[in-house]
Each structure stands twice: as C-alpha cells, then as structure tokens.
C-alpha cells in the first residue's frame, strides 16, 4: 500500500489564507490546496506557485496548488476556512454577519461534497457564529467542526505578558475563554510564567491593562494597518491547530467548540479549553470559575448570542 501525504485545503487565498498555506507547507503537515473564487483564480495560482518555488530554498517537501475548483480539494483530511469579507476600521464584527454567513453556506456545501470525512477549522469572523453556521450546514459531528480564536487570543495575551516581564514567550501559558470579541475572558488565575502564577509576578493594575489590551488586540491591529486585519498570528494559530489534529498530539488548546451543557451552556459555539487530537475536539475541559469569571463568561455568551440572532 502506498503511503500518501495528508491533504489540507485552505479556502480563501487572502492574506490569512495564503499565510496559513505557506506555514502548513513549511511545517510539512501535508500537501496544500489554496482555493478562492473564479475571479481570483490566477492570483491564487500565482501565490501557490510562488510558495512552491521557495521550497528548495527553505527545504520543505509539500506540493502547493492554487485553484477555484473545489474538485481539487477532494478527499482533504482538513479544510481550513478563511474566506469572507474582512473587517474595516469602524466596522463591528456583527456587520460582517450576513455577508459572511452566505459565504460560509456556499463554501460548506462544496467542502462536504468533496471531502465528507474531513475536519473543518473556521477562522472567518464573527467566528463563533460562522463556526455554528458551518456546523449546521455540514451535518458533521461536533468534534469535526472547530473554530479558531482562543489560540490567537491566548498568543496575544502571552506576548503582552512576556513583554511586561521581559521573559521568553515560551515560558508563558494562559487561557482565554468565551467569544472572540471585546467580551472575551482571559483567565488570569490559570495563567503562568515558568510555572509561577502571573498574579505573583505582575501587579493587578498592570495585569488588568494586559487583559484589556488582549480584548482589543484584533482592533489594535486593524487600526494600525488602516486596511484589513491581522494575518500572521491568526495563520500561525490555525497551523498549530492543524498540526495537533494531523499528528494526533492531544494538545490542550483553547478552541471554539459546540457546547452541550459544559459551563452551563447548550447549543452554542464558544471558546473553551479543549483536548485537540486526531479525532478533532476530543474533550472540553471544564475549569472551576469564580463568580466574577462566571459573570464575565455570561456577558461574553450574551455577545455571541446577539450575533447569532442576526443569522438567517
């Protein structure tokens, strides 16, 4: 029997999609198919070819193709969805809902048709609602449809903590709960630097400022760029999740998972600590929360539900 490389399709060849494809190829996680709409087929092919031509220099073996034909994605092991319109300065995530929901429905139909056994990771904003849309549209079990926000939000939190303490980011661990928006809940009590609780290392006022900056992290970059939104850190976060599934690493990572009673919520996609491995979301980890944290999470859930109400 011939051993085959894994196949990963990335839907949406904008900054985030293309960067994700490039990181996946560099990590040799599988062959990569980069997909966009027919009007953008040539630029998509150009990006894929450009990446492929870097492989002799960077020393990775992975085939990368660009296409607008979903038939090229057939039998993908993992499909990453980054397609959708981007958020512009002054635009709330909620403004994106109706347009991106239509895009999610179209994309999901094609994905399911050609890769009925794949795992789907959704990045498109507002990500909690878009992941729910893909879940409903696909008919897949909940463990195979996953949203990405917590890895990114936690990466931002870890970055700011490392800067504050002037230490390696590798030594900082943390968790962000809830929706991917201004009401996310960075769990300071469960965050450490070199195994030492952050509360022992950083004064409360500084920690509060870091939490606030984490909440506004996406908006900070949108405003600095002036056009478009973050893509390097989101792409790296997607690649970490893809790697956890493909290599069956059983990583404890924050992910947007479908809740059926965990944390007291039902029938909603929300950012929670999960075990991510070869079977997708293998477990939702329930942490003990203080009353204050529960209240913050409830506020975050309400924000997600407000977006969900816009869904058609």
From Swiss-Prot:
It catalyses: (S)-malate + NAD(+) = oxaloacetate + NADH + H(+). NAD(+) binds at residues 12-17, 36, 100, 123-125. Keywords: NAD, Oxidoreductase, Phosphoprotein, Tricarboxylic acid cycle. It is an enzyme of class 1 (oxidoreductase). The active site is at 180 (proton acceptor). The modification Phosphoserine is found at residue 149. InterPro entries: L-lactate/malate_DH, Lactate/malate_DH_C, Lactate/malate_DH_N, Lactate_DH/Glyco_Ohase_4_C, Malate_DH_type3, NAD(P)-bd_dom_sf. One of its GO terms (biological process) is tricarboxylic acid cycle. GO terms for molecular function: L-lactate dehydrogenase activity; L-malate dehydrogenase (NAD+) activity. Pfam families: Ldh_1_C (PF02866), Ldh_1_N (PF00056). Substrate binds at residues 87, 93, 125, 156. Its EC number is 1.1.1.37. Disulfide bonds: none annotated. Belongs to the LDH/MDH superfamily. MDH type 3 family. PANTHER family: L-2-HYDROXYCARBOXYLATE DEHYDROGENASE (NAD(P)(+)), L-LACTATE DEHYDROGENASE. Catalyzes the reversible oxidation of malate to oxaloacetate. This is Malate dehydrogenase. The gene is mdh.
